[in-house]
């Protein structure tokens, strides 16, 4: 299931995934992708960037680059991973998969039958760039870079939860944050808002008051 979820995070448009899943081999998928693109199908939703990295990606299309990672994922024995953290650790060893994408796969994986009882279900998260900057802002840092270690930010998020949030949120809201990724998402959105508010970045999307 891990390779299929990785496919879902690479091609994150539901109407496209109907034609691409399950992943079998690169050639067949590239053929289908090319046909869908030629027919005007939207392949990516733009929720996050999918860049090609380093010398491994030189001369390759985005499709080829990430499909090679999906193929490599089909050769891993994921049953040997006992925690979400171990899945993420193994994912980032695949060429082309960074911490952000690995965390997104694990965010989905925790809601599958095989992983709903993972021992780190309520605690695991890999903090992406936006989450890191959001945590820095809460710590009082202006124009943050989010360049400290993953361990630092994981500890900062745990401290934020334990000391500031766990006994102050209404039960209905708190239920959502049992999945630590939801807190991570809030920190990322907070960073986007603050970057625009302080003139650190251009506004790409309009904020709508509810």
Regions found by a protein language model. Name each.
Residues 1-56, 210:
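Structure-specific DNA junction-binding interface
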Residues 34-90:
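A contiguous catalytic/ligand-binding core that recognizes phosphate-bearing ligands
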Residues 94-95:
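Acyl activation and transfer enzymes in specialized metabolism, enriched
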């Amino acid at each position: 299931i891990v390779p299929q979820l990785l496919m879902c995070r690479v091609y994150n448009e539901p109407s496209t995934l109907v034609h691409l899943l399950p992943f079998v081999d690169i050639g067949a998928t590239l053929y289908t992708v090319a046909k869908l693109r030629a027919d005007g199908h939207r392949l990516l939703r733009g929720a996050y960037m999918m860049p090609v990295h380093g010398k491994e990606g030189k001369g390759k299309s985005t499709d080829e680059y990430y499909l090679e990672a999906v193929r490599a994922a089909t050769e891993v024995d994921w049953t040997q991973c006992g925690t979400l953290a171990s899945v993420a650790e193994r994912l980032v060893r695949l060429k082309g998969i960074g911490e952000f994408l690995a965390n997104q796969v694990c965010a989905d994986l925790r809601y599958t039958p095989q992983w709903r009882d993972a021992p780190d279900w309520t605690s695991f998260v890999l903090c992406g760039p936006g989450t890191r900057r959001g945590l820095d802002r809460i710590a009082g840092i202006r124009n943050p870079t989010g360049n400290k270690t993953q361990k630092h930010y994981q500890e900062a998020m745990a401290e934020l939860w334990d000391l500031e949030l766990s006994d102050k949120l209404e039960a209905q809201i708190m239920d959502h944050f049992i999945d630590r990724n939801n807190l991570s998402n809030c920190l990322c959105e907070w960073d986007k808002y603050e970057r625009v508010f302080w003139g650190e970045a251009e506004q790409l999307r309009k904020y709508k008051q509810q």
